[in-house]
């Protein structure tokens, strides 16, 4: 004789999906080992979970209604949709079913071990109706606020911010970064934890500006009483040996002598794509002077087919000493003001 899942949950065969949920909620709370210390509680808790797993699934329930437990587990119920025979085996962890039903956390942990108001202990708790009413909890597992109508929501932990350093070459071409994070995850029992590593993939788009944020929602540590934090990476430019960044423009500083600043010179200016641009400077280089090469900067974030400019600044090197004769020559040929 197979198991009577309807009898286990205390419902009849015509029960609706909502009836199944209510029955499981009631029986699971009644026989949960953290509350019920009787020797039979663990086995009853497991039976209730298995009954719910079957009756809450339309496919399993249909096969069970026609062929019973033996037919469900023995493959008498047709195919699995891929040409194979459908067979059901209970996974054996009623705590996983309980945690999934109540949203991944154990609602008992905040009140088990206490005596209830009015002198009742947990063994005498009333299960019919709303089983959470004695604890200030609503049917969906959220804490009740006596001064409000709706359930109060769990709060999310503050975001966890990480600085992500990228080179100008990576911003110029775009790249993929893979960041390994470690976080705590709740086990199916909703109480204990495990450590888990995860690789987060970040697609760095061409031209992204410093300060750009990449958010991975709810990838932080899991806790029973809060929503996991978002993991946020913030783009930070690495220091470059040749260039500085000015928005989508690239700034290159050319070092020249005083004679070159006054008499002119020829330069080879490096670019982000590895080339050198020949540049002839014929004007007198004055303080703060810049030369602009259009279209040789970084891609625009919103239109990566277009680029900013390459800006050339000049760092004029003055001599430490100069002879008296040279001073006299300069005095004769340079204007006084």
Swiss-Prot record:
Main location: cytoplasm
Alphabetized UniProt keyword annotations: Cell membrane, Chaperone, Cytoplasm, Membrane, Phosphoprotein
Intracellular or extracellular location(s): Cytoplasm; Cell membrane; Cytoplasm, Myofibril, Sarcomere, Z line
UniProt GO MF annotations: ATPase activator activity; protein-folding chaperone binding; unfolded protein binding
GO process terms (BP): protein folding
A cellular-component GO term for this protein: plasma membrane
Pfam family, one: DnaJ_C
SMART domains the UniProt entry points to: DnaJ
UniProt xrefs under SUPFAM superfamilies: Chaperone J-domain, HSP40/DnaJ peptide-binding domain
Family annotation (Gene3D superfamilies): DnaJ domain, Urease metallochaperone UreE, N-terminal domain
Residues the record lists as Phosphoserine modifications: 122, 148
Phenotype on disruption: Knockout animals show muscle weakness and fiber atrophy with prominent diaphragm involvement and kyphosis. Knockout muscle and myotubes have myofibrillar disorganization and accumulated Z-disk proteins and protein chaperones.
Domain J: start-end pairs: 4-68
Coiled-coil annotated spans: none
PANTHER family: DNAJ HOMOLOG SUBFAMILY B MEMBER 4 (PTHR24078:SF288), DNAJ HOMOLOG SUBFAMILY C MEMBER (PTHR24078)
Function: Probable chaperone. Stimulates ATP hydrolysis and the folding of unfolded proteins mediated by HSPA1A/B (in vitro).
Record's subunit section: Homodimer. The C-terminal section interacts with the C-terminal tail of OPRM1. Also interacts with SDIM1.
Name assigned to this protein: DnaJ homolog subfamily B member 4
Species of provenance: Mus musculus (Mouse)
Gene name of the record: Dnajb4
């Amino acid at each position: 004789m197979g198991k009577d899942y309807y009898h286990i949950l205390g419902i009849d065969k015509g029960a609706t999906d909502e009836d199944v949920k209510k029955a499981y909620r009631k029986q699971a709370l009644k026989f949960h080992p953290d509350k019920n210390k009787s020797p039979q509680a663990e086995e009853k808790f497991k039976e209730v979970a298995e009954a719910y797993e079957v009756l809450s699934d339309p496919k399993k329930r249909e096969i069970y209604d026609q062929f019973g437990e033996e037919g469900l587990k023995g493959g008498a119920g047709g195919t699995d949709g891929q040409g194979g025979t459908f067979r059901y085996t209970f996974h054996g962890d009623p705590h996983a079913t309980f945690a999934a039903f109540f949203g991944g956390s154990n609602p008992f942990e905040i009140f088990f071990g206490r005596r209830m108001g009015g002198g009742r202990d947990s063994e005498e708790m009333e299960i019919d109706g709303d089983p959470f009413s004695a604890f200030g909890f609503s049917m969906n597992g959220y804490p009740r606020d006596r001064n409000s109508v709706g359930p109060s929501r769990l709060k999310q932990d503050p975001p966890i911010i990480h600085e992500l350093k990228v080179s100008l070459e990576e911003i110029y071409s775009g790249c993929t970064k893979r960041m390994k994070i470690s976080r705590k995850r709740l086990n199916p029992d909703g109480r204990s934890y495990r450590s888990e590593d995860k690789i987060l993939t970040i697609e760095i788009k061409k031209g992204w500006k410093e300060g750009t944020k990449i958010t991975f929602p709810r990838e932080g540590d899991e806790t029973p009483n809060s929503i996991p934090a978002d993991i946020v990476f913030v783009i930070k430019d690495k220091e470059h040996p040749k260039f500085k960044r000015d928005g989508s423009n690239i700034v290159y500083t050319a070092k020249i002598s005083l004679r070159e600043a006054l008499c002119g010179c020829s330069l080879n200016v490096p670019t982000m794509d590895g080339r050198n641009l020949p540049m002839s400077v014929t004007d007198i280089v004055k303080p703060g002077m810049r030369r602009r090469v259009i279209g040789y900067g970084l891609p625009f974030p919103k239109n990566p087919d277009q680029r900013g400019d390459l800006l050339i600044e000049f760092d004029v090197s003055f001599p430490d000493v100069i002879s008296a004769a040279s001073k006299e020559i300069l005095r004769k040929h340079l204007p006084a003001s």
